[in-house]
Amino acid sequence: MAAKKSFIIKQKLAKAKNQNRPLPQWYRLKTNNKIRYNAKRRHWRRTKLGL
C-alpha cells in the first residue's frame, strides 16, 4: 500500500477495518438469536480487499 492514498481508498480501508470485527457478546445473548459468529471476517493475509 502506497504512503500517499487517495481519500476514497482511505475511506474504503476504514470501512473494511470496521467491518472486520467479531460479534458483540451482548448480541449473542439476545433471545432467539441464531447468529453465533461473524461470517464475513477477513484475514489480512488470506483474503485481500482488491482495491
Swiss-Prot record:
Pfam families according to UniProt: Ribosomal_L39 (PF00832)
This protein's GO CC annotations: cytosolic large ribosomal subunit
Molecular-function annotations in GO: structural constituent of ribosome
Entry annotated with the keyword Ribosomal protein: yes
Biological process (GO), any one: translation
Keywords: Ribonucleoprotein, Ribosomal protein
Assembly with partners or alone: Interacts with YIH1.
Similarity comment: Belongs to the eukaryotic ribosomal protein eL39 family.
HAMAP family: Ribosomal_eL39
Protein's name according to its UniProt entry: Large ribosomal subunit protein eL39
